[in-house]
């Protein structure tokens, strides 16, 4: 395997790193105190000689009452001041963890969430003109009405892995290097990098993701497993040249716990990356990085976020999407060809899709804000990745593993619109469960899910925990089933992800043969659509959403170390092209006209978010 290593400029000086020793003190597994100023705003003052992110400090703030939200508080100390007992205990604990072999150790602070929202926190970390800076915001709405307990966000990954047709680029922003390799299976690259670390389970943090890899794996990622059967050379036209895989390693993450009304700012210390692998040096750098993260969340000038007025009817028909990669006649013809393959016994089912395009001057982040209103879903995603921005409201999990090493697959198939009343919902649920076509399609997908889970699970542990239950979402209801298994001892989350891609709900059955036919029928590559987007945490937890109901906004080049700019032109409004891809599951008795209309309706639901963004933000 040929490797070329080229030195490049570090990422941003602020993050590479605005982390000098002597910055804010933090505590391993124990949170720090927070000061509130006269306006009631949470503040953490940096020590003398440092600033929020760089350069000399401002004059010290007036002291106000100190509110401790933990049993122990830490105070900033200058080098000339003797270490306090609490600081000595923290250093000893950190050193003990390092001596036990842990080389990835988390520090964190927690603050009240009453003056901070996930949207505002994201804008504090990522400025309006930094649309190409890799970053993410993950939120959740359960049952269409209940906010999920956690929201996650982060920016400035320390490392990125980007793959395109076997060419893998590893960008190390901390060291300022770029390594290019040829890989037969790029999914293994992030896994191999992760093997360097023995992470320490954070004390006091909620049981959730708090740092690790975040990004997407596109539909075409599966080709690496079946290069002979699904070669890139026979794939549809690659008109956007987006990466097959794009992952960022985030050691600085902000976690909102909506149940306890707290925000956790987390930094993971890489002990081995410290000079000489020294634990004390790693702790000092970690304290500085954590301090910079906390300070970034409470800037002197709060970012301006237009309120956005919701004056349009959210149930009104959205603007029509007419620009597609397939005309209606072409789609109907492709459905007919698919049914011929089914009757010939080649396949049982195939998911046929096409891609719509919509131009708008609404900023992608404004579209995400509108999407949260229009279509709240279990997986609300705003992801700035290499070459594109993903704006998603996916209802469906691709795969999940937890710290107990349980593998979860939850196919969704079979859909009805929500009723206006509870009685209508109940009647629609009964109608959905009585639909033989919907049940047959769902049964095939459950079988595919059992097979995917079985490939990575211990014998005898694969179970269908729930079968054909109706789940309600904000605008629709779906038939859902849940398949679980116990992960084999020698496998990890990356193996689970490899086995799950792509989901049967976006490919068909049998999976590989269906994908071969999709290559023949569809006009362009799917890109992120039909793949997975989510996270793999340091502790092995993984949650990947299926990239459905996902808007893809092409941005720029995908192969450069990101650069941030204050150029006024980048702050001005520009025209964006938003891609919305949707598909329909074709079976033997499918009606071509109905299947086409299903794809149009699915895409239109996302177009409503663009309509709202344009109206609410006066675009």
Where are these regions (language model features)?
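Extended alpha-helical targeting/anchoring segments
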Residues: 74-619
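Intrinsically disordered, low-complexity polyampholyte segments enriched for Lys and acidic residues
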Residues: 27, 37, 41, 62, ...
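Intrinsic-disorder/low-complexity peptide segments enriched for small residues
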Residues: 13-15, 22, 51, 64-67, ...
């Amino acid at each position: 395997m040929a490797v070329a290593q080229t030195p490049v400029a570090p990422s941003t000086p602020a993050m590479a790193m605005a982390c000098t020793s002597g910055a804010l003190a933090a505590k391993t597994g124990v949170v720090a105190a927070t000061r509130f100023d006269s306006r009631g705003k949470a503040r953490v003052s940096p020590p003398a000689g440092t600033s929020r992110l760089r350069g000399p400090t401002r004059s010290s703030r007036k002291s106000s009452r100190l509110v401790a939200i933990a049993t122990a508080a830490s105070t900033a100390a200058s080098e000339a001041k003797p270490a306090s007992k609490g600081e000595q205990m923290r250093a000893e604990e950190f050193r003990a963890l390092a001596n036990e072999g842990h080389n990835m150790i988390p520090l964190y602070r927690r603050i009240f969430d009453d003056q901070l929202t996930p949207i505002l926190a994201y804008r504090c970390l990522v400025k309006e003109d930094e649309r190409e800076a890799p970053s993410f915001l993950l939120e959740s709405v359960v049952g269409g009405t209940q906010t999920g307990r956690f929201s996650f966000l982060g920016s400035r990954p320390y490392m990125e892995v980007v793959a395109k047709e076997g060419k893998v680029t590893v960008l190390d922003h901390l060291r300022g290097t770029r390594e290019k390799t040829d890989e037969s299976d790029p999914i293994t690259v992030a896994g191999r990098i992760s093997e360097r670390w023995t992470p320490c389970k954070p004390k006091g943090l909620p049981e959730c993701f708090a740092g690790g890899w975040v990004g997407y794996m596109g539909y075409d990622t599966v080709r690496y497993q079946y290069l002979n059967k699904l070669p890139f050379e026979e794939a549809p036209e690659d008109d956007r040249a987006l990466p097959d895989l794009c992952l960022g390693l985030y050691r600085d993450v902000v976690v909102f716990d909506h149940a306890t009304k707290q925000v956790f700012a987390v930094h993971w210390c890489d002990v081995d990356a410290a000079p000489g692998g020294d634990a004390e040096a790693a702790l000092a750098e970690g304290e500085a990085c954590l301090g910079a993260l906390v300070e970034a969340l409470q800037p002197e000038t709060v970012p301006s976020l237009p309120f956005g007025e919701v004056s349009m009817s959210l149930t009104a028909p959205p603007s029509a999407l007419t620009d597609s990669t397939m005309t209606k006649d072409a789609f109907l013809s492709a459905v007919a060809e698919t049914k011929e393959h089914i009757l010939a016994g080649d396949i049982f089912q195939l998911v046929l899709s096409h891609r719509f395009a919509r131009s708008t001057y609404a900023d992608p982040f404004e579209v995400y804000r509108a999407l949260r209103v229009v279509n709240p879903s279990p997986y609300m995603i705003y992801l700035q990745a290499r070459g594109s921005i993903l704006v998603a409201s996916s209802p469906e999990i691709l795969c999940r593993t937890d710290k107990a090493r349980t593998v979860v697959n939850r196919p969704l198939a079979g859909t009805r619109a929500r009723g206006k009343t509870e009685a209508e919902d109940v009647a629609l649920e009964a109608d959905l469960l009585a639909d033989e076509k919907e049940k047959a399609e769902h049964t095939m997908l459950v079988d595919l899910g059992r097979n995917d889970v079985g490939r990575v699970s211990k014998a005898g542990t694969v179970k269908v925990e729930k079968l054909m239950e109706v789940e309600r979402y904000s605008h629709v209801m779906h038939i859902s089933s849940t398949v679980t298994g116990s992960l084999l001892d020698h496998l990890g989350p990356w193996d689970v992800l490899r086995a799950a891609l792509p989901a049967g709900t976006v490919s068909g059955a049998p999976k590989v043969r269906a994908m071969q036919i999709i290559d023949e029928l569809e006009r362009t590559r799917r890109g992120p659509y039909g793949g997975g987007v989510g996270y793999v945490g340091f502790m092995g937890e993984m949650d990947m959403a299926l990239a459905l109901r996902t808007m893809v906004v092409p941005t720029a080049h995908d192969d450069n170390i990101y650069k941030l700019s204050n150029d006024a032109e980048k702050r001005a409004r520009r025209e964006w092209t938003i891609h919305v891809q949707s598909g329909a599951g074709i079976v033997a008795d499918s009606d071509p006209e109905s299947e086409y209309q299903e794809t149009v309706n699915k895409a239109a639901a996302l177009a409503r978010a663009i309509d709202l963004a344009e109206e609410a933000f006066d675009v």
